[in-house]
């Protein structure tokens, strides 16, 4: 009887081995869920982007809102440009603005390329048109979860003047342009690292000179009436840029001076970021 049982067991083992070899019996394959696949497919966050965003947030300055006179007044200006007139009262709300222009390091972290002629991680990115600036901001916001944007022209001028700490300087931080700006007379026609001149009353650097800075507004003539948080017209042919650049003369660099350019044209223009909250 024992021999019979043993022979039956051996026959069963042999049959099982044969069926496995022929693929009749298969081991269960672990089920991979769609969520597991998604987790596996997600790339690791870029350390360069994380570092760039952390540095950007650390350099944001809170600007307390207030009311100021926007446009050209006759008190210190010794030239006249009708686009800067008439002076008018404007009220802006509080916002955050970066103390530096967007650097080439920050730009490259999200765009991969660098359009600037003078290269250097700590130099402002330049030769950026308005359309590409918006593309950069969308990528930055998608990664950071923040809502960075370009300043309105009113926000830009309010910050350049020093906000509610303003001393009414002709340039952003001084009546002597050489204190605060890289411009036609001292730049050597090349970009310079951000933050190497004196800041203005809000601790903002290079609001005058180095590179023009894009604003969000379409260009239109000033109306002269008091306004609150103006954003410009809904459409137009040119976008506002402010502050002057390394090729600009002092008549273009005043805190009230206005310039404009088509949004698809790249000049010696960069950008400075603002946001409503951090």
Predicted regions and their residues:
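Extended beta-strand/loop cores of jelly-roll/beta-sandwich
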Residues: 3-5, 21-154, 238, 258-278
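Bacterial N-terminal signal peptides
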Residues: 8-18
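Surface-exposed recognition segments
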Residues: 76-90, 164-165, 187-190, 207-278
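Signature tryptophan residues that serve as conserved aromatic anchors
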Residues: 107, 130, 156, 182-183, ...
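Feature responds to low-complexity, polar/acidic, surface-exposed segments characteristic
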Residues: 116-120, 171-173, 224
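A short, contiguous structural element within a folded domain that forms the immediate neighborhood
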Residues: 179-204
């Amino acid at each position: 009887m024992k021999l019979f049982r043993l022979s039956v067991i051996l026959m069963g083992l042999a049959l099982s081995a044969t069926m496995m070899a022929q693929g009749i019996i298969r081991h269960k394959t672990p089920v991979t869920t769609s969520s597991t696949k998604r987790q596996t497919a997600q790339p690791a966050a870029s350390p360069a982007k994380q570092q760039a965003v952390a540095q950007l947030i650390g350099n944001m300055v809170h600007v307390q809102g207030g009311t100021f006179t926007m446009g050209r007044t006759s008190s210190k200006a010794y030239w006249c440009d009708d686009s800067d007139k008439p002076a008018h009262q404007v009220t802006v709300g509080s916002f955050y603005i970066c103390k530096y222009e967007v650097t080439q390091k920050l730009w490259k972290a999200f765009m991969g390329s660098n359009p600037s002629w003078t290269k250097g991680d700590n130099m402002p990115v330049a030769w950026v048109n308005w359309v590409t600036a918006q593309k950069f901001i969308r990528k930055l916001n998608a990664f950071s979860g923040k809502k960075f944007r370009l300043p309105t022209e009113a926000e830009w001028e309010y910050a350049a003047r020093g906000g509610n700490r303003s001393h009414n300087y002709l340039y952003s931080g001084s009546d002597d342009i050489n204190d605060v700006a890289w411009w036609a007379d001292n730049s050597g026609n090349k970009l310079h690292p951000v933050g190497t001149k004196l800041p203005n009353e809000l601790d903002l650097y290079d609001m005058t000179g180095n590179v023009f800075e894009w604003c969000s507004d379409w260009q239109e003539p000033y109306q002269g009436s008091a306004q609150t948080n103006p954003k410009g017209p809904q459409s137009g042919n040119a976008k506002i840029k402010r502050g002057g650049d390394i090729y600009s003369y002092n008549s273009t660099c005043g805190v009230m001076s206005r310039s404009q350019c088509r949004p698809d044209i790249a000049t010696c223009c960069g950008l400075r970021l603002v946001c409503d909250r951090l």
